[in-house]
Amino acid sequence: MRKLASFLLTLLLTALPLKEALALNCYLGGSGGPVEETKTISPFAIPSNAQVGQKIWESDDIKIPVTCDNNVTSGFKPEDVFAWVNPYPAATDPYYELGVTYEGIDYDATGQPNGVDTRQCLDNDNITIYTPDQIRQMGWENRICSGNPDDIHITRTFVARLRLFVRIKAMPPHGYVSSLSDYIVVQFDGKGGVNQMADAKNLKYHINGLQNITVLDCGATFTIYPENQEIDFGTFSARDIVNQQTRMRTFSIRTTKVQDAQCSDGFKMDSSFYTTETLSADDTAVLIGNGLKLRILNGTAPYTFNQYKEYADFTGDKMNVEQNYTAELSREEGKAIQSGPFETVVLFKINYH
């Protein structure tokens, strides 16, 4: 009997860590939703003048609705939700490196898994057996995400904003086709690490379609006017904005195809105005944070930030494309304008295809 008791005790002790490892579930959309999502890279091209270390493709902004629940870790402890980049290190392409831009920060899918805090905290399911008053009497406020026993969340739903990208780690030869197919770039899981069980209910985001990449023997150059790449709205008062409604400045981007003896490929380009700042009006306005907002116009139509659209076609005889834009500054609805200098950064990005 002593041997049997000892054996059973050992089994229980070794089983406990496994139970904790399976503690957190995360789904696409609502609780019980899908746990697999795939982004297929649309066909795109690498210009001949691309540089090692440069991003050669980016997705549009991807806004993923994530719901996490089932925190049953021991000790009634809360759990932080993490986005794990490169959760399953595996064979990679010799020329291309995958990555994720999460909340404006780049994470390469190389080496060991890289945990990114989503700033979402999940209260323990088991703590709900106690009333808020009982939790206070036990001094367990520190086991509640908010520190308030009246504000317990055993389910969290949030929107993860990310972009997928491909970076060059070595210049591929003309005509190269990648053999890398499906790759998991992100998994939503607990702070403790990646749940690799086959039946894990942890949302995984896949990327595939690297075989759609074409290596060009041509490229293009860009010239931005004004040449300092700064748009200066000058000095003005809040009253000026109220009276005039908007202040406008123009700028332009000229793109020239590099046509040399080696260039035999035609190609197209998509462009995007990219920002990490807060957006409004269906992502057509950047909120500067001082009561003002910025739009970029094509004629009178506003561009949607962080979304790619067709920009230039060099499949024919055309060698140059010049596009004029208007930067429009106006008052943010319902906000008072704060005086003082300000700046915001918007990047012009290109995908070849």
Locate predicted features.
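Charged, low-complexity surface segments at secondary-structure and domain boundaries
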Residues: T10-L11, N25
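Mature extracellular/passenger domains of Gram-negative fimbrial/pilin and adhesin proteins
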Residues: L22-H353
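Intrinsically disordered, low-complexity serine/threonine-rich segments
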Residues: L9-T10, E328
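Bacterial N-terminal signal peptides that target proteins for export
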Residues: M1-L8
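C-terminal segment of classical bacterial N-terminal signal peptides
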Residues: L13-E20
